[in-house]
């Protein structure tokens, strides 16, 4: 061990010479890790165990930033426990289910006591001592009951803390800042704003009433033991999005990330120019390595999911010596990020009743197209010299519908692949299992959309009961079709002849001839709004779900008019819809009490799968 490292370690040990806890650094040094990286690993895992820090170091062995002197960022929060926490967690769950995710869902229920600040890795234990001393100083004057006053505005909902209890909490935050400055050389800015516990922030205005009703179920008088909790985060990724891997992924190329289920990945939305459609560039939280990853293997995680809880101080005058040990060992034994456990969700029967008791609109993207897999020349690959169709690969459909102008018209109106048909059937089967009641079906005139609707209805056992209403107004933005000479949809008669149960009597909001190649973005969102108005007026007024099968763009342009939201910016719109996978869904429910629609969880889970590349057995034989 270098002399400088020995001196640094001695300084840390001497500063806390009175502590009885054994050093966590010695085992790491004995394993051969340098002092600075060992201290970095201890700080990143909450200084819980040497084993956790060693695991972190092994995981980050190829981390290019391992030797960089980048400290963690820390913050102190006042967190509720007990019955009050259970009620707050129930609000977190229900508000997200009924009103979609808002900024408050990114973090657990808390009162912020100070801004985030940095602390050198070798001084983190001094920070723990500062927390203990500040807590002991205020323990006798900390309020036995913290009154919470509900406050609501058009973009904020939360509890305010007023009067003398707020003064006592501020005094504690100031004491912590003072102790940390002396012991750990940290500059901490205690919170100067009115103390508050946020319930919802930056939500859609039409959700305000629902959120207020949910908040009224939280009784501030619920029993609660307040705990001061010290958390840390990686300061480099504050403005990144956090993704969570749903499945294992083994890299196919050297520049791809290895993923294990549960891994977190940091993604900078502004630095994705190099990534192709369906991929992202990210940095693994587990390894620190950078690379490409398939987006459909991940889901959005909460900001605080990667935060690490270090130590807590519980305010309780009756605390004995055993319970005070909570301060010494209050975070997870494995050093993993802290995620508050949620109370059990409502029963499946209650969820089903809630689903079928409202009128709903389910917007679904079509399944996988043949040209998505085999490229623009797919038609040449499956056409004989005399213009007949044959199946060169199992992912080509068994047959194609007859068209009056021949097979060439499929070039601009491709069918579903075999996998696309399977996707549609899988979604239909899941809808059947969920118990929802589909009462009407609309589809874009594109063959892939009508096919998807047909296969979903077949799995729902409704293919003979419900007719597909073809609505040209929900076809995708014509700007994306500008390279195609003309749109060549199958006529209703051709669809009928091909055994599609289409409604020949339905009068669409817009005729096919209204789809013009020079369409602007404003014209596109306007025709979608007009079409949705017609669909809503045409749908049965009784309870049930109207199924709309269209394109990825429809998940945005067909739902925002329902929700009363203005059109998205054109650039944001294009970036958003390119990431929507096959059979992606958005679900809107009508709230008849206020005559508005809410965006809620779809009745079925998402569909995710990997690629299956082309294989030639001749090449395999010759390689031997």
Curated annotation (Swiss-Prot):
A Pfam family per the record: His_Phos_1
Record domain UBA: where: 19-60
Localization: Cytoplasm; Nucleus
Limits of the SH3 domain: 238-303
Principal location class: cytoplasm
Record keywords: Cytoplasm, Nucleus, SH3 domain
Chain positions covered by the region annotation Phosphatase-like: 358-624
InterPro entries according to UniProt: His_Pase_superF_clade-1, His_PPase_superfam, Phosphatase_SH3-domain, SH3-like_dom_sf, SH3_domain, UBA, UBA-like_sf, UBASH3A_SH3
GO terms under cellular component: cytosol; nuclear speck
Keyword rRNA processing: no
CDD domains from the UniProt entry: HP_PGM_like, SH3_UBASH3A, UBA_UBS3A_like
Listed GO biological process terms: negative regulation of T cell receptor signaling pathway; regulation of cytokine production
Record's function text: Interferes with CBL-mediated down-regulation and degradation of receptor-type tyrosine kinases. Promotes accumulation of activated target receptors, such as T-cell receptors, EGFR and PDGFRB, on the cell surface. May inhibit dynamin-dependent endocytic pathways by functionally sequestering dynamin via its SH3 domain. Exhibits negligible protein tyrosine phosphatase activity at neutral pH. May act as a dominant-negative regulator of UBASH3B-dependent dephosphorylation.
Further comment: Has very nearly lost all enzyme activity. Has very low, but measurable tyrosine phosphatase activity at pH 5.0.
Subunit details: Homodimer or homooligomer. Interacts with CBL. Part of a complex containing CBL and activated EGFR. Interacts with ubiquitin and with mono-ubiquitinated proteins. Interacts with dynamin.
Protein name per Swiss-Prot or TrEMBL: Ubiquitin-associated and SH3 domain-containing protein A
Gene: Ubash3a
